[in-house]
Amino acid sequence: MGIKAYKPTSPGRRQMTVLTFEEITKKEPEKSLLAPLTKKAGRNVYGRITVRHRGGGHKRRYRIIDFKRDKDGIPGKVAAIEYDPNRTAFIALIHYADGEKRYIIAPHGLKVGDIVESGENVDIKVGNALPLRNIPVGTIVHNIELIPGKGGQLVRAAGAAAQLMAKEGDYVHIRMPSGEIRLINANCRATIGQVSNIDHENVKIGKAGRSRWLGIRPTVRGSAMNPVDHPHGGGEGKAPIGHPGPLTPWGKPALGYKTRKKGKASDKFIVKRRK
């Protein structure tokens, strides 16, 4: 997957880069695997903003993804690699031998015509899914479950990869993309390989309008607000923030402040914190 730059016909175009999408083999999605997707604009069920800077963007349809990979013993053939507007990774359309079609997160290197399987003792091959206890130490994995049978929740973004570091009783040690080493139940499933679209991190948005296409709204500086709106607000001209250090809009320290709750139940599963 390459990255394409443009001739500088405008200031926004000068900075912009896009993926070449060489891996994509199919433009239209599988209709049977689509669902409607309504925009939430960062609001919860009470209508209050819980995630700032969200809203607008191009209309999308949700692609139903198989995160569980529970179709054991039935081989599936990769029919297409597709773009998914709802995630940074590409998705693969799988045609199973019994006639069923499913989408999975496409691993890097998976091609049309490849065979993928899931089960207890399938081959250690890119795209195959099996329990962590049956995966050799040192293997690169993604789409990792936290609870057996719930479906993959970890390491699903473009280019992400985790590594199985050790096995210890009912748990395995997984090194996450953040550097954190975590204990995960050995019965949880993971998929072999690294997530596709590894060049995603190198793409430059280039202009404000492209962020708006993605549903990302502007981020206003606190110092540009009034005192009622932000701790940094107010003052004449470019006034200092008036505090020992920068604060969040809610008055909490913005830098160096630990935001993880103390005594969290999952603390015992963290062997080494992220860097």
UniProtKB/Swiss-Prot annotation:
A single BP term in Gene Ontology: cytoplasmic translation
Q: Which InterPro entries match?
A: NA-bd_OB-fold, Rib_uL2_dom2, Ribosomal_uL2, Ribosomal_uL2_bac/org-type, Ribosomal_uL2_C, Ribosomal_uL2_CS, Ribosomal_uL2_dom3, Ribosomal_uL2_RNA-bd_dom
- For bias kind Basic and acidic residues, which ranges apply? 264-275
The Swiss-Prot or TrEMBL record annotates one GO molecular function as: transferase activity
Which SUPFAM superfamilies does the entry link to?
Nucleic acid-binding proteins, Translation proteins SH3-like domain
The record's similarity note reads:
Belongs to the universal ribosomal protein uL2 family.
> What is this protein called in UniProt?
Large ribosomal subunit protein uL2
Keywords, comma-separated and alphabetical: Ribonucleoprotein, Ribosomal protein, RNA-binding, rRNA-binding
Q: What does this protein do?
A: One of the primary rRNA binding proteins. Required for association of the 30S and 50S subunits to form the 70S ribosome, for tRNA binding and peptide bond formation. It has been suggested to have peptidyltransferase activity; this is somewhat controversial. Makes several contacts with the 16S rRNA in the 70S ribosome.
What segment(s) does the record annotate as region Disordered? 224-275
The keyword Ribosomal protein is annotated on this UniProt entry: yes
Q: What lineage, starting at the top, does this entry show?
A: Bacteria, Bacillati, Bacillota, Clostridia, Thermoanaerobacterales
Extract one GO cellular component term from the record.
large ribosomal subunit
